[in-house]
Structure formats: C-alpha cells, structure tokens
C-alpha cells in the first residue's frame, strides 16, 4: 500500500494542481483506489484505508469542484458496493444530475439508484430533475431518467410523474417507448388506482412491431391484469393479435437479431404465453382462440436445448390453466413426461412439481408415466426424490395399489430419515383406502412397522390395532407375525408397541395357534416363550417409559390368558419388581396390577378381552417431520387414539388433547369411550350419563362394591351410594385420565351400549347436471371434527343409452383446495350408477363453490358442457 502513496507524491511533485487535488481527496482516481484496496493484507488495513478515503472525499465535497465531484462520487459508489457507509454522497449525486454533461448525469443517476430508495427523504428533491430530463431532447438523457424512475419511484413520485410517463409511452422513439412501459409497470405496482391511465396505451403498444417494445408491453399487460380483474375484458379483445404475434415467432425463419439457440426471441414467446394463460383462464372463447397456436408451439418447438424446454414448459402451464381441449391437455402431460427423461435436474424437478398439481385433473394421463416417476425415486437429487414421492402418493388407486406400494416399500428401506415419517403415513393410508383384502392390508402395515417403526405416527398405529380387533379370522396370523417380528428386532418402537399390545390382548390365540413358519423354520409358541419375550423387551436398551407401560398392561392381561401357573407366578414377580420404579406412572401401574392379580374373584372380569373399538377412516393433519411416536406422544392421548378417538390434530401431527377441543367433539369422544368401557363417567359428560346409568343398574351390587373397594378398605357405604347415583364411579385413575388398557375395571363387554360417535353431517343430494340422458348429482358430507373438509360424492346415472368416455373435471376458487379421485367407471349404463369422490378444503364458514366441466360420448356424438355449483347454506 505504501507504494501507492509514494507514486502519489511523485505525481504531486510533477503537477502542483494534481498534488493539491490528491491532498484533498486521497487517492487520485477510482482505479488507484481499487488497486490500493486489493493490496491490503488484512481486513483491518482495508477498513483503515476506506475510513481515510471516505474522510478525504467528505472534505473534497466542500470545495465544489465539478471535476473532483465526479471522481469522488465514482470512488464513493465503489466504497458503497463494498458495504461501507456512503450516505453522505446523496446530495452530491443530485448536483451531478443537475449538470448538463451526459457523463455527469449518468454517474449521478447511478448514484441515486444505489444510495437512495423510495423511503429516503432526499428522494423528494429528485422528482423535479427527473421531470426535466424526461422532456430532454436527447433520448439517452431521457432514458437515464426513465431508468432511475423505474428503480426508485415512490407512491408520491408515481402520482407526480404519471402524466409524463403516459405521454412518453406514445413517443415515436422505440427506445423511449419500451422504457416508459417499464416505468408504467412500476406505477401500476405502487399506485393501482392509476391503472386506468395505461390500459389503452398498453393495448396500443401490443400492436407494435418492435420486439423490445412488444416485450415490455406484454409485461405491463400481465401486471395490469394481475392488479385489476376488469382489465381482463379489455385485453381479451387482443387475444387474436397476441396469437398472431406468437404464430409469426414460431413460423418465421432465421432472424439473427433475435435468434437464441435456433429459436426466435424465446423471451417474447414466454411472455406472450404467460399473458395468454391469464386471459384464457375461465374463459372458453379466449381459450378456443388460442388452442391451435398452443398445439403448434408444443409440436414445433425443439426440445433439445433449454431454450426450447422453457417455451414448452410455459406452453404446458398455459394449456393446463385455460379451458383447453382434452387432447391438448394430454399433449401437455406427455411433454411433462418427456421432461422426466431429461438429464437436467431442473427440468425434471419442474416436471414433477407440475404433474403433482395436475394429477387431480387427469389422473389417467399421468398414470402413463408412472414408471418414469418411480425411477425418479432413485435419483441422486433429494429434491427430485421428494417431488417424486409426493406424486407417487397421488397416483395410488385400486388398480395399482399393489405395484406402487411394493415400490414405495422398497424405497422405504433406503430412504433418508426425513422421508420416512411421511412415507409410513402415506403407505398406511393408501393401504387402508385401497387394500384389495384385509390380509394384504395387515401385511403392508407390518412391513412398514418392521422397516421404519421409529417413524410411524400414533394415528397409524391405533388404526392398525383397530383393524386387528375387527378381523378375528386374521388375529392368529397377525399375533404370530408380530411375535416373530418383535423377537427379531426391539429397535423399532411402533413395532414393539403394536406387538406388545396385540400379544397381551390375544395371547391365548397365540398359544392356541399351534405351529407357524418363522424365517423358514417351524416353531410352536409356549407360554414361557411369550413371557420371555416381554421380559426381554423390558431389559432391552431401546425400552422407554411408554413401552414399559404397555408391557406391564400386557403382562397383566396374559396372567388371565395363560394357564401355566409357573408363568403366572413369574408375571407377578416381574410386575412387582416395578413397584419401586422412579417413574410414577410405572410405579402406579405395578402396584395396581399387583393388587388386582391377587383378587381372583374379579381379575378375570376386569382383564377380559376388550370389545372391538369402532373402526373408522384414519384422519390426519399435516405430516410433521418431528419424532412421530413415543417421545412426542402424551400418555393420556395414547389410549384415546388407540381406541379410535378423533381428537383434533395439530399441524405438528400429534393429537389435540392439549388443545382445547370443541364441545361437540369432546362430548362425542367421551361418549364413545364410555360405551367401549361398559359405562364409565369419563369426566361427567352429560350425554354419557343415561347409558352409564343403565349399565350400572344391570350389575350386581356385590360386583360394584368389589370394584369400588378394590384399592381401599371400608368402601361399602360409598359403593351403595355410587350404585344409586345416575352415573357409576369412574375407573381407577392413571395418567390416561381415568382410562386404562384393562378395558374398564369390572366393566364387562355385555354392558356396552351402541357407541355415540361424532355423526357426519350429510347434506341431501343436489342434481347439478341433466342433459343428453346423463344425470350428475353431488352429495356433500362433512365431519364435525373437521368442518373445513367437505367430502363430495359425484354420482353418474344414465336414463336411456350407455354413455362412454366420461371426463369429469372440477375447478375451485383460490381459497379452496381440491383433490379428485378417478371415476369408478368411465362408461355409465342405464342400469348402473358410477361414482367419483372429491375432497374440498374450504375456509371456515365458507361454502363449496365448483366449476364443473363434463365431456362424454352418447350415441356416437361427443358432448362437452360446463356448469357452476355452489353448496346451499345449511
């Protein structure tokens, strides 16, 4: 750095004027400053140099030397680009703009754009200078002013200079017109009230022959359409003109001025396609006008280079957004399928992302590319794997559930941990929804538990247990499989929980099941083997508090299910060993179970098999990437979920017991559990009282007294009072809020009453279409626990002849979210009814609104129609 100062002194000795200038302004020019900064060895040296140079520049500004001002502003802007403060040069930039020299104006405007923003107070001083330069005879000076305006204009400046910008949009100079159009876009964004000033001007510019002006005009039109829906009507009249522009770009020969990789002006083509997409949305006439040119672009554009791919991608988005023909939509999806075979990861990503959005529109067309989508699961790019997974979930249906599930399970073995929670959830939901039979369903969930048992949500685990309880013909098979799986691996928490629960509940079935194959070996399970396995679980390094709770309950149940006295004694010893546990819940269970097992007169009734809980569809919220089960599960919620409860689900994926549920949901939950357990008060819920009272009245007095006096002495008087009360005494309390896996102390299954479940609200069917012999009705269904989700069943019937090739499409407003499944059969016969499920998520309190498009063939004629439907208010 010292060499620069030496040269500085040498120059000063040769020319006193330059020496004085350098003395006041530090280094002589920008080039010298850059070299000096680059030669600094440390950051401290650079800061010291910048500080000294900034001080010299600040001092030089006081001399009002025009030559020095230009030089100092150039150095100051470089200092600003390095991240150091340079705000003290703002006024000097205004002085440069006021000079007549073009070079000074150029540097001054550059400084204004860098040092000022729309919130700076100094900006108000710039307005007059911009107005004067916009009227300058030199188009380059005018261009500088327009460029500055487009970068920093505030709302006030936009209002002040709106008329000047509108006037310049009609200039005869193409250079000025295109810059004025960009300035108009800035005004439209800042002050939407001024849109009316530019609608007509923009429409005139859309007829311009200059590609630069046309590009800016189309960009401005896009912004106006986004800001003002009324402008859509005006610009839709220009659709034929835009189609003509696009056609000339596609069919024109080689144009050196606009050619990019053999394609004429791809930037303009993309902008026109984007504007056509906006204008054609929800407008059949405009869509019909652009169908042919879109097909031409999709067919003739070369896809060997990224330039062509960008145009094809924009074309696909346009086709999918407008009311295009079915053939055109299939072509668009096929283009996306070709993108999946591209080597460029970016192209494959956007293809997967777009297919995920359109799979509900035309599932069959996307299904054709299923193999390529599955290949993307093995891609090295994690983002592509994630998008391929999401798309694979959407493709699962009754016909391909076996194939896709097999592929997903294969990928689950090698998937990253961050994918496993979502995968286990989606695989199990697909198995629940599309399983060809219950054995395949059970095998699939068992496979999931073995592969990723630490990444299974508690809702999935409880749904699996409900399934086992409701499938008595497969209980022996399931308990044997779980016994074998747990014997091989203790590390998968959900597998351990499921196996322990099922073994405890169906231990007698396991013992009586006889021989079964285990790893190509035939084995027979003895009572000792069962107790040994559960004891090994308690001693394993993977055990936690929740597993201990499950094992203790399972052992207590096995005590009544095993006839081997030695194993019963061993179970009592294992349970008693936890009476001094430091975990309160474990200690409490151990003491209660130990006391219960000594009461031979009641333990058989207390520990008898539970009645199967009500089976229902698993309802999940947003899949969280957090730990799914065990550590994230509260003890109180575990049993509620296990018994089929539908507590509100938070976005984190856990149950909503800690979030105050609505009264209706909470009441229904307690009613359900009260019936399952044979009539407990469950916290004194009013609606459960009648059933509980009736249940209590049927029980012998001695049994009630025994239950109430189970863990205390002298309970006869309270017992009599409890028997006469309208509600029975609650079950023994635990961290489950009065509920236990025992199935209710003393509550027999015969006393259970029909479960009062949260009833779904079913609206009457609404006929939305009746033409050409085809009748379509919609039946919306909502669940009080999830009122924002509306399940709609579309039913198709034919009055006369067969109707084929039915293509039923639906669109919703931006505030709704729609999922559609495939129709049960695309051909409707007069004696049949076909269905197609829809799932709509709406904002709270909003009604469902659908725009329906129906295409079909009847008597050899193709019919295409459209109708709107709004859900009537309740």
Curated annotation (Swiss-Prot):
What does the record list as GO biological process? cytosolic transport; endosomal transport; Golgi to vacuole transport; intracellular protein transport
Keywords, sorted A to Z: Cytoplasmic vesicle, Golgi apparatus, Membrane, Protein transport, Transport
Q: Where in the cell is it found?
A: Cytoplasmic vesicle, Clathrin-coated vesicle membrane; Golgi apparatus
Q: Please give the GO cellular component terms listed in this UniProt entry.
A: AP-1 adaptor complex; cytosol
List the GO molecular function terms: clathrin adaptor activity
According to the entry, every stretch annotated as the GAE domain falls at: 761-873
**Membrane protein topology class:** Peripheral membrane protein
Q: What's the main place this protein lives? A: membrane
Q: Name the family the entry cites.
A: Belongs to the adaptor complexes large subunit family.
The job of this chain, per UniProt, is described as: Adaptins are components of the adaptor complexes which link clathrin to receptors in coated vesicles. Clathrin-associated protein complexes are believed to interact with the cytoplasmic tails of membrane proteins, leading to their selection and concentration. The AP-1 complex interacts directly with clathrin. Required for apical growth extension.
The entry describes its oligomerization and partners as: Adaptor protein complex 1 (AP-1) is a heterotetramer composed of two large adaptins (gamma-type subunit APL4 and beta-type subunit APL2), a medium adaptin (mu-type subunit APM1) and a small adaptin (sigma-type subunit APS1). AP-1 interacts with clathrin.
Tell me the protein's name: AP-1 complex subunit gamma-1
Q: Which species is this record about?
A: Mycosarcoma maydis
The uppermost taxa in this organism's lineage are:
Eukaryota, Fungi, Dikarya, Basidiomycota, Ustilaginomycotina
Encoding gene (name): APL4
């Amino acid at each position: 750095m010292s060499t620069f100062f030496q040269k500085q002194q040498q120059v000063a000795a040769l020319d006193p004027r330059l020496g004085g200038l350098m003395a006041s302004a530090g280094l002589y020019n920008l080039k010298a400053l850059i070299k000096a900064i680059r030669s600094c060895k440390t950051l401290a040296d650079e800061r010291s140099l910048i500080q000294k140079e900034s001080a010299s520049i600040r001092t030089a500004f006081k001399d009002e030397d025009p030559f020095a001002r230009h030089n100092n502003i150039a150095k100051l802007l470089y200092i600003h680009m390095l991240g150091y403060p340079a705000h003290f040069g703002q006024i000097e930039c205004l002085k440069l703009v006021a000079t007549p020299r073009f070079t000074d104006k150029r540097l001054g405007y550059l400084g204004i754009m860098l040092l000022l923003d729309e919130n700076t107070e100094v900006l108000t001083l710039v307005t007059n200078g911009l107005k004067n330069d916009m009227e300058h005879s030199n188009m380059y000076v005018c261009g500088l002013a327009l460029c500055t305006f487009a970068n920093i204009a505030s709302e006030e400046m936009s209002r002040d200079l709106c008329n000047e910008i509108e006037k310049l949009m009609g200039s005869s100079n193409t250079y000025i017109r295109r810059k004025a159009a960009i300035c108009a876009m800035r005004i439209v964004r800042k002050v939407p009230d001024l849109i009316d000033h530019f609608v007509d001007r923009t429409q005139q510019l859309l007829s311009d022959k200059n590609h630069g002006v046309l590009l800016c005009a189309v960009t401005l039109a896009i912004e106006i359409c986004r800001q003002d829906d009324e402008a859509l009507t005006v610009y839709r009249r220009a659709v034929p003109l835009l189609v003509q522009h696009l056609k000339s770009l596609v069919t024109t020969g080689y144009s050196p001025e606009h050619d990019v990789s053999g394609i004429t002006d791809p930037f303009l083509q993309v902008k026109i396609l984007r504007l056509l997409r906006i204008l054609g949305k929800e407008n059949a006439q405009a869509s019909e006008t652009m169908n042919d040119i879109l097909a031409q672009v999709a067919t003739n554009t070369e896809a060997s280079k990224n330039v062509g791919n960008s145009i094809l991608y924009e074309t696909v988005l346009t086709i999918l957004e407008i009311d295009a023909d079915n053939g055109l939509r299939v072509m668009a999806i096929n283009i996306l399928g070709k993108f999946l075979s591209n080597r460029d990861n970016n192209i494959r990503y956007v293809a997967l992302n777009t297919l995920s959005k359109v799979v509900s529109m035309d599932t069959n067309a996307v299904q054709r590319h299923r193999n390529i989508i599955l290949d993307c699961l093995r891609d090295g790019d994690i983002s592509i794997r994630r998008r391929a997974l999401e798309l694979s979930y959407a493709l699962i249906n009754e016909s391909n559930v076996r194939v896709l599930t097999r592929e997903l399970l294969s990928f689950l073995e090698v998937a990253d941990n961050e994918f496993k929670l979502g995968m286990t959830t989606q695989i199990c939901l697909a198995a629940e929804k599309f399983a060809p039979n219950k054995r395949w369903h059970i095998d699939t969930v068992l496979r999931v538990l073995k592969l990723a048992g630490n990444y299974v949500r508690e809702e999935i685990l409880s749904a699996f247990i409900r399934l086992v309880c409701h499938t008595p013909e497969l209980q022996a098979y399931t308990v044997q499989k779980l016994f074998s799986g747990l014997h091989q691996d203790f590390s998968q928490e959900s597998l351990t929980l499921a196996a322990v629960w099922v073994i405890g509940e169906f231990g007698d079935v396991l013992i009586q099941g006889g021989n079964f194959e285990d790893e190509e070996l035939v084995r027979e399970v003895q009572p000792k083997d069962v107790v040994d396995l559960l004891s090994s679980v308690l001693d394993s390094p993977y055990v936690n508090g929740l597993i201990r709770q499950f094992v203790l309950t399972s052992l207590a149940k096995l005590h009544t299910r095993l006839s081997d006295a030695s194993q019963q004694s061993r179970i009592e010893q294992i349970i008693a060993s936890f009476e001094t546990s430091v975990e309160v819940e474990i200690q409490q269970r151990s003491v209660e179970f130990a006391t219960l097992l000594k009461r031979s007169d009641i333990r058989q009734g207390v520990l008898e098999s539970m009645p199967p809980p009500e089976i229902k569809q698993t309802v999940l919220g947003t899949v969280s990437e957090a730990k799914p089960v065990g550590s994230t599960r509260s003890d109180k919620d575990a049993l509620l979920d296990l018994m089929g409860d539908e507590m509100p689900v938070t976005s984190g994926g856990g149950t909503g017991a800690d979030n105050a549920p609505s009264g209706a949901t909470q009441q229904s939950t307690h009613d359900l559990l009260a019936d399952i357990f044979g009539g407990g008060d469950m916290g004194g819920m009013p609606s459960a009282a009648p059933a509980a009272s009736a249940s209590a009245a049927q029980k012998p007095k001695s049994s009630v007294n025994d239950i109430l006096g189970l863990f205390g002495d002298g309970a006869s008087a309270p017992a009599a009072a409890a028997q006469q009360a309208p509600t029975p005494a609650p079950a023994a309390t635990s961290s489950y809020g009065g509920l236990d896996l025992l199935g209710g102390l003393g509550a027999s299954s015969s006393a259970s009453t029909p479960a009062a479940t949260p009833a779904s609200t079913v609206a009457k069917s609404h006929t939305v279409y009746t033409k050409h012999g085809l009748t379509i009705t919609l039946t919306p269904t909502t669940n009080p626990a999830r009122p924002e989700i509306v399940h709609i069943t579309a039913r198709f019937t034919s009055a006369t002849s067969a109707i084929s090739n039915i293509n039923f499409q639906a669109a919703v407003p931006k505030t709704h979210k729609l999922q559609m499944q495939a129709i049960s059969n695309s051909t409707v016969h007069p004696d049949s009814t076909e269905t197609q499920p829809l799932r709509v998520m709406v904002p709270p309190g909003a009604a469902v609104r659908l725009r329906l498009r129906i295409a079909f063939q009847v008597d050899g004629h193709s019919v295409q129609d459209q109708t709107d439907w709004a859900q009537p208010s309740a």
